[in-house]
Amino acid sequence: LAAAVQQAINNNPDVTARLNALRAAANEVDVARGQYLPSVDLSASVGRDSDRITSRSPASQSLSRNGLALSASQILWDGMATSKEVSRLGHARLTRYFEFLGATEETALEATRAYLDVERYRKLVSLAEDNYVQHKYAFDQLQTKFKAGVGRGVDAEQANARLALAESNLTTEQANLHDVSARYLRIVGDLPPASSAAVNPQLSKGILPANIDTINQALAQHPSISAAIENLRAAQAQAQGAESRYQPTVEARVRTGVGKNFDGVQDQKRDSSAEILLNWNLFNGGSDKARVRQYADLINQAADQRDRACRDVRQTVAIAHNDIRKLQDQLVALDRNVLAIEKARDAYRQQFDIGQRSLLDLLNAENELYTAKRSYANAETDLQLAYARTQAAKYSLTSTLGLSREAEGTQELVQDWQAADDAAQRCPVTAIDVKATSLGELDARARKLAVPALTAAPVVAAPSAPAPVASPAVATVQQRLRDWADAWMAKDVDGYLSFYAKDFAPSRSTSAKWIAERRRLVSKTGTIELTLDDIQTQAHGD
């Protein structure tokens, strides 16, 4: 996985395009800094001038001329326009830098997704192959029985239909594997490795259990938020630079020239000049005021984009982190599901072989097992992908994999970088708290639905015989026993202990140690399941 991701971030066009944009932004800063230095120009000319002046004798005159001139100019004051432009382009460069980091992390995530999807569909193809083999085995058995005259034709047709479906499923999974391999080639730049490898177990490293802590990490580190903040600062510098249009520009100029008949003056050999030039625009139709209003609106737009980026990151990391918890719980349930269905399928096959189960029962069990294994394989891959999504959302995927892709000469750019007062204003750090459903409570509700059936009078064959009715004492004991179990599954320690007498003492421990052990067991994570079957009660006396 790490090798595939490293290859992707080194060669993917999305990353290299951002890198070239960063380099261009760095050169643009140097372009603006050139305004701090003087401009030096060299000019040379050769030609012939003709003129006619009636007060001169002769009135018409022609001169051959040539000359060489050197001039230099230096901006002395421009209302801080150059300084603000350099500042704006510096922030624009940082924007490109953070966009480069974001593209690197996003490409690392996409490469991880492509790698995991290839592994996913290789597993699904293998499961589809096994499913086809099982259906082919059942079909061949029925064909043999049918040809021997001991099987039914309708069973053979059913088996043939299910075999065709298994073949279709295999074809679909192979097509899916082809498609994700093509996506892998696009992102990584090479074909997937021929053999499957274990997924890097480090994907879960450093992920905090609390959703709010993970959100805090993401909002503090994600480069898309940092890029939006620098974009806002660039807009602010641009607006400050617009104020320079209300001030004059002062420029120093020096010029010297040599030549023959230089500058149209006969016999002139040399010409030198030095001057200070002030230029102050007094009116330009209100364009400067309109430009100030325009830049103010652009600042507001950049602030909106910053808050939008923050909210996007907050949503992304919250969903990815919640998917981790969801998929961890799902895998436990799906594992139990696969084991139970596998046992049922094996039992159905044995019963089918001795004629106690129909073919439809067996084929349904095979399909259910295939579906269960497919769901488990998908959940396994989705969990690894959820780890990767969470790492990428808090900008730690490449570092978790031990990889990096730095642009040369950029380390000092963000050495002391901080969001400071430019952090997002409309993006509070909030975690969504959805109350988890207690399986113990749901189980208790299910048992309450069964109470009337358990306490109802049994139906007897002879109407003349009185139906036995459970005594109130027996019904009360049964209900109290269920309440005791419900309190334990709901982790209500005080309610659970209330069912015991104050002088109750366990046979192998003290009462205090027993209570402490009960509380320790209840405090463990996970659900408690307790099933009471075949409750036997007997009333003594009236």
Predicted regions and their residues:
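Short, low-complexity N-terminal intrinsically disordered segments enriched in polar/charged residues
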Residues: 459-490, 494-498
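Surface-exposed, charged secondary-structure patches
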Residues: 516-542
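Sec/SRP-type N-terminal targeting helices
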Residues: 16-20, 33-34, 76-104, 129, ...
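Hydrophobic, lipid-facing positions within transmembrane beta-strands of outer-membrane proteins
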Residues: 66-72, 214, 272-278
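Periplasmic alpha-helical coiled-coil/stalk elements that build and connect Gram-negative outer-membrane
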Residues: 103-217, 323, 327-330, 347, ...
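A short glycine-centered flexible hinge/capping loop motif at secondary-structure junctions
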Residues: 146-150, 187, 352-356, 393-397
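Acidic, low-complexity, intrinsically disordered peripheral segments
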Residues: 377-463
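Short flexible linkers and secondary-structure junctions
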Residues: 1-117, 125, 135, 153, ...
